[in-house]
């Protein structure tokens, strides 16, 4: 830039600079280009600064005129840049909206819905059937003590179930319950007969994991205490429940042994051509009633228990209990 420009020439150069800047700002396509133009025209080493370097040869009266004109130009260019950035921002947003526009006439792709876990639905179905028979739901703690889990149920100290290899002991007298029967004892401590309860819950045993065993599984146990109850009431209740759950599968009772019931039986259903054990049951041992202060001469009762996993596997034709715990959506989406 010549250092001998007159006032008139400087004003002319400012007008040319204004026209050039306005044209280039208007044609800019993105914010990066705008920033380059800002530095080119308004930066410390930009065209406006270089042009104003010619003011040194002007008179004291002329310099304020050029300075004022340069400030007006700078403000105008800053406004043009600001307006252009807003335009570019609006255009970018419009492009995004166009790309994200939903075609309301397009057919739906469907929404993936969650499903209740088959163990939960099986438990609820079992409970609903017993609620229909007049039973009430009763629940208890999963951390139990020796008395409720063993002693009150007539399980002697030398019984195999108390062995460290079968029970998770937590220290002292506490353990993870091996069945939901302790719920029945707690209930009978607070309620007087007649009592009819169903007790669902998670239980724990030191079982190796395989196709039919798990160290954590679910049980539902049933207890009825009333006057003049006998084995025919037990058998009728179990038969009604199993037929309602499984349909017309053949059912049989086999004599068995449980410490807290006498007589005791195991219940099988015929499934895929074979007999499959699904329940244990029996008449409540009078010793258990006496321990709870219930007169066994006046009251009698029966108890029955089942594994929810076994019922779920039979209901859905599963051959491996581990499928119920893997959280594999490909498997769970079937239910």
From Swiss-Prot:
Cited NCBIfam families: pheS (TIGR00468)
Places the protein is found: Cytoplasm
Quaternary data: Tetramer of two alpha and two beta subunits.
Keyword annotations: Aminoacyl-tRNA synthetase, ATP-binding, Cytoplasm, Ligase, Magnesium, Metal-binding, Nucleotide-binding, Protein biosynthesis
One cellular-component annotation, GO: cytoplasm
Protein species of origin: Prochlorococcus marinus (strain NATL2A)
GO molecular function, one term: tRNA binding
Protein name: Phenylalanine--tRNA ligase alpha subunit
Sites where the protein binds Mg(2+): 262
CDD domains attached to this UniProt entry: PheRS_alpha_core
Top-tier EC class: ligase
Family: Belongs to the class-II aminoacyl-tRNA synthetase family. Phe-tRNA synthetase alpha subunit type 1 subfamily.
Reaction equation(s) it catalyzes: tRNA(Phe) + L-phenylalanine + ATP = L-phenylalanyl-tRNA(Phe) + AMP + diphosphate + H(+)
Example of a GO biological process term: phenylalanyl-tRNA aminoacylation
EC number of the protein: 6.1.1.20
Alphabetized SUPFAM superfamilies for the sequence: Class II aaRS and biotin synthetases, tRNA-binding arm
InterPro entries: aa-tRNA-synth_II (IPR006195), aa-tRNA-synth_II/BPL/LPL (IPR045864), Phe-tRNA-synth_IIc_asu (IPR004529), Phe-tRNA_ligase_II_N (IPR004188), Phe_tRNA_ligase_alpha1_bac (IPR022911), Phenylalanyl-tRNA_Synthase (IPR002319), tRNA-bd_arm (IPR010978)
Cofactor: Mg(2+)
Co-factor binding details: Binds 2 magnesium ions per tetramer.
């Amino acid at each position: 830039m010549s250092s001998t420009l007159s006032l008139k020439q400087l004003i002319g150069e400012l007008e040319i600079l204004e026209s050039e800047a306005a044209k280039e700002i208007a044609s800019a396509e993105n914010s990066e280009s705008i920033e380059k133009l800002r530095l080119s025209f308004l930066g410390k080493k930009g065209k406006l600064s270089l042009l104003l370097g010619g003011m040194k040869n002007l008179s004291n009266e002329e310099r304020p005129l050029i300075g004022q004109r340069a400030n007006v130009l700078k403000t105008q260019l800053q406004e043009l840049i600001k307006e252009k950035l807003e335009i570019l921002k609006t255009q970018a947003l419009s492009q995004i909206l166009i790309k994200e526009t939903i075609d309301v006439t397009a057919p739906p792709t469907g929404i993936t819905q969650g499903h209740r876990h088959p163990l939960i639905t099986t438990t609820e179905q079992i409970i609903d059937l017993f609620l229909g028979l007049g039973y009430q739901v009763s629940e208890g703690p999963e951390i139990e003590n020796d008395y409720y889990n063993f002693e009150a149920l007539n399980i002697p100290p030398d019984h195999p179930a108390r062995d460290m290899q079968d029970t998770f002991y937590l220290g002292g007298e506490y353990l993870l319950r091996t069945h939901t029967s302790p719920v029945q004892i707690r209930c009978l401590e607070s309620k007087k007969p007649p009592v009819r309860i169903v007790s669902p819950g998670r239980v724990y045993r030191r079982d190796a994991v395989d196709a039919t065993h798990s160290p954590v599984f679910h049980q539902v146990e049933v207890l009825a205490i009333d006057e003049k109850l006998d084995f025919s009431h037990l058998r009728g209740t179990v038969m009604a429940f199993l037929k309602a759950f499984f349909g017309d599968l053949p059912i049989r009772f086999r004599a068995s042994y449980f410490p807290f019931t006498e007589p005791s039986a195991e219940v099988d259903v015929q499934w895929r051509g074979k007999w499959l054990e699904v329940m244990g049951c029996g008449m409540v041992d009078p010793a258990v009633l006496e321990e709870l202060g219930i007169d066994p001469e006046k009251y009698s009762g029966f108890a029955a228990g089942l594994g929810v996993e076994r019922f779920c596997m039979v209901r859905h034709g599963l051959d491996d209990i581990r499928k119920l715990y893997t959280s594999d959506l490909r498997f769970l989406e079937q239910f």
